[in-house]
Protein backbone atom coordinates (compact mmCIF):
# COMPACT_ATOMS: atom_id res chain seq x y z
CA UNK A 1 0.00 0.00 0.00
CA UNK A 2 1.40 3.36 -1.07
CA UNK A 3 1.10 6.69 0.73
CA UNK A 4 1.27 9.66 -1.65
CA UNK A 5 1.89 13.27 -0.60
CA UNK A 6 1.59 16.29 -2.87
CA UNK A 7 4.71 18.46 -2.59
CA UNK A 8 4.34 21.13 -5.27
CA UNK A 9 1.50 23.49 -6.13
CA UNK A 10 -0.58 24.00 -9.24
CA UNK A 11 1.17 26.94 -10.94
CA UNK A 12 2.54 26.12 -14.40
CA UNK A 13 1.37 22.52 -14.34
CA UNK A 14 0.40 20.69 -17.54
CA UNK A 15 -3.26 19.80 -17.91
CA UNK A 16 -2.74 16.04 -18.13
CA UNK A 17 -0.66 16.04 -14.93
CA UNK A 18 -3.26 18.23 -13.18
CA UNK A 19 -5.96 15.75 -14.23
CA UNK A 20 -3.89 12.87 -12.86
CA UNK A 21 -3.47 14.64 -9.53
CA UNK A 22 -7.22 15.30 -9.42
CA UNK A 23 -7.90 11.60 -10.05
CA UNK A 24 -5.63 10.81 -7.11
CA UNK A 25 -7.59 13.34 -4.95
CA UNK A 26 -4.44 15.41 -4.44
CA UNK A 27 -5.76 18.92 -4.94
CA UNK A 28 -3.52 20.86 -2.54
CA UNK A 29 -0.01 20.86 -1.12
CA UNK A 30 0.50 18.62 1.94
CA UNK A 31 -2.54 16.48 1.17
CA UNK A 32 -1.97 12.74 1.35
CA UNK A 33 -3.82 9.70 0.03
CA UNK A 34 -3.34 5.96 0.45
CA UNK A 35 -3.76 3.67 -2.56
CA UNK A 36 -3.20 -0.02 -3.33
CA UNK A 37 -0.21 -1.09 -5.42
CA UNK A 38 -1.78 -1.71 -8.84
CA UNK A 39 -0.30 -1.18 -12.33
CA UNK A 40 -2.79 1.57 -13.17
CA UNK A 41 -1.90 3.54 -10.03
CA UNK A 42 1.82 3.04 -10.69
CA UNK A 43 1.37 4.63 -14.12
CA UNK A 44 -0.38 7.59 -12.52
CA UNK A 45 2.46 7.96 -10.02
CA UNK A 46 5.04 8.00 -12.82
CA UNK A 47 3.10 10.67 -14.68
CA UNK A 48 2.88 12.95 -11.62
CA UNK A 49 6.32 12.14 -10.17
CA UNK A 50 7.54 15.76 -10.43
CA UNK A 51 4.81 16.99 -8.07
CA UNK A 52 4.43 14.20 -5.49
CA UNK A 53 6.38 11.83 -3.30
CA UNK A 54 5.32 8.28 -2.45
CA UNK A 55 6.41 5.09 -0.76
CA UNK A 56 5.24 2.02 1.13
CA UNK A 57 3.52 3.06 4.34
CA UNK A 58 4.01 0.94 7.47
CA UNK A 59 1.10 -0.34 9.51
CA UNK A 60 2.03 1.72 12.59
CA UNK A 61 2.27 4.95 10.61
CA UNK A 62 -1.02 4.21 8.88
CA UNK A 63 -2.76 3.64 12.23
CA UNK A 64 -1.41 6.99 13.45
CA UNK A 65 -2.49 8.69 10.22
CA UNK A 66 -6.07 7.40 10.43
CA UNK A 67 -6.48 8.13 14.14
CA UNK A 68 -4.95 11.63 14.05
CA UNK A 69 -5.83 12.92 10.58
CA UNK A 70 -8.72 10.76 9.40
CA UNK A 71 -11.91 12.77 8.91
CA UNK A 72 -15.57 12.07 8.32
CA UNK A 73 -17.80 14.15 6.04
CA UNK A 74 -18.40 17.50 7.73
CA UNK A 75 -14.76 17.56 8.91
CA UNK A 76 -15.56 15.53 12.03
CA UNK A 77 -12.88 13.45 13.71
CA UNK A 78 -13.03 9.66 13.57
CA UNK A 79 -14.01 8.32 16.99
CA UNK A 80 -14.35 4.85 18.45
CA UNK A 81 -18.08 5.48 18.91
CA UNK A 82 -18.53 6.24 15.20
CA UNK A 83 -16.54 3.16 14.22
CA UNK A 84 -18.59 0.90 16.53
CA UNK A 85 -21.92 2.25 15.22
CA UNK A 86 -21.16 2.34 11.49
CA UNK A 87 -18.64 -0.45 10.82
CA UNK A 88 -17.93 -4.02 11.89
CA UNK A 89 -14.90 -2.94 13.95
CA UNK A 90 -14.56 -1.97 17.60
CA UNK A 91 -11.99 0.84 17.43
CA UNK A 92 -10.27 3.24 15.09
CA UNK A 93 -7.09 1.19 15.39
CA UNK A 94 -8.88 -2.03 14.35
CA UNK A 95 -10.44 -0.18 11.40
CA UNK A 96 -7.02 1.14 10.36
CA UNK A 97 -5.54 -2.38 10.43
CA UNK A 98 -8.45 -3.66 8.30
CA UNK A 99 -7.96 -0.89 5.74
CA UNK A 100 -4.20 -1.52 5.71
CA UNK A 101 -4.78 -5.24 5.05
CA UNK A 102 -7.30 -4.30 2.31
CA UNK A 103 -10.22 -5.99 4.07
CA UNK A 104 -12.21 -2.76 3.69
CA UNK A 105 -11.65 0.69 2.16
CA UNK A 106 -11.77 4.26 3.41
CA UNK A 107 -14.87 4.82 1.28
CA UNK A 108 -16.70 1.77 2.66
CA UNK A 109 -16.00 2.86 6.23
CA UNK A 110 -17.29 6.40 5.60
CA UNK A 111 -13.97 8.23 5.92
CA UNK A 112 -12.78 10.91 3.52
CA UNK A 113 -10.32 9.56 0.92
CA UNK A 114 -7.59 12.07 1.77
CA UNK A 115 -5.64 13.26 4.79
CA UNK A 116 -4.89 16.96 5.25
CA UNK A 117 -1.45 17.22 6.81
CA UNK A 118 0.73 20.02 8.14
CA UNK A 119 3.91 20.95 6.27
CA UNK A 120 6.76 18.85 7.69
CA UNK A 121 8.63 20.07 10.74
CA UNK A 122 12.05 21.39 9.62
CA UNK A 123 10.63 21.71 6.09
CA UNK A 124 11.04 19.80 2.85
CA UNK A 125 14.57 19.02 1.67
CA UNK A 126 14.13 20.55 -1.81
CA UNK A 127 10.90 20.72 -3.76
CA UNK A 128 12.55 20.65 -7.19
CA UNK A 129 14.91 17.68 -6.85
CA UNK A 130 14.15 13.99 -6.59
CA UNK A 131 14.63 12.10 -3.35
CA UNK A 132 17.69 10.34 -4.79
CA UNK A 133 19.31 13.73 -5.56
CA UNK A 134 18.68 14.99 -2.03
CA UNK A 135 15.25 16.52 -2.63
CA UNK A 136 11.69 15.58 -1.76
CA UNK A 137 10.08 14.43 -5.01
CA UNK A 138 9.52 10.94 -6.37
CA UNK A 139 9.70 7.46 -4.91
CA UNK A 140 11.17 7.13 -1.41
CA UNK A 141 10.14 3.58 -0.31
CA UNK A 142 10.10 3.20 3.51
CA UNK A 143 11.35 6.76 4.08
CA UNK A 144 7.79 7.99 3.50
CA UNK A 145 7.01 6.95 7.08
CA UNK A 146 9.48 9.46 8.53
CA UNK A 147 8.02 12.25 6.38
CA UNK A 148 4.46 11.34 7.38
CA UNK A 149 5.37 11.38 11.07
CA UNK A 150 6.89 14.85 10.64
CA UNK A 151 3.66 16.03 8.99
CA UNK A 152 1.08 14.50 11.36
UniProtKB/Swiss-Prot annotation:
Taxon lineage: Archaea, Methanobacteriati, Methanobacteriota, Methanomada group, Methanobacteria
Gene3D superfamilies assigned to the protein according to its UniProt record, in alphabetical order: 1.10.15.30, Ribosomal protein L30, ferredoxin-like fold domain
Originating organism: Methanosphaera stadtmanae (strain ATCC 43021 / DSM 3091 / JCM 11832 / MCB-3)
InterPro entries: Ribo_uL30_ferredoxin-like_sf, Ribosomal_uL30, Ribosomal_uL30_arc, Ribosomal_uL30_CS, Ribosomal_uL30_euk_arc, Ribosomal_uL30_ferredoxin-like
Keyword terms: Ribonucleoprotein, Ribosomal protein
UniProt record similarity statement: Belongs to the universal ribosomal protein uL30 family.
Molecular function, one GO term: RNA binding
One Pfam family this sequence matches: Ribosomal_L30
Top-level taxon: Archaea
Protein name listed in UniProt: Large ribosomal subunit protein uL30
Family matches, as PROSITE patterns: RIBOSOMAL_L30
Amino acid sequence: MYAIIRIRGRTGIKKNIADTLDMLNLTRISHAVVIPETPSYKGMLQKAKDYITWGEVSEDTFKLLVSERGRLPGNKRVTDEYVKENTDYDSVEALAVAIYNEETTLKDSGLKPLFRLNPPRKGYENTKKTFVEGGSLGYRSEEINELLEKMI
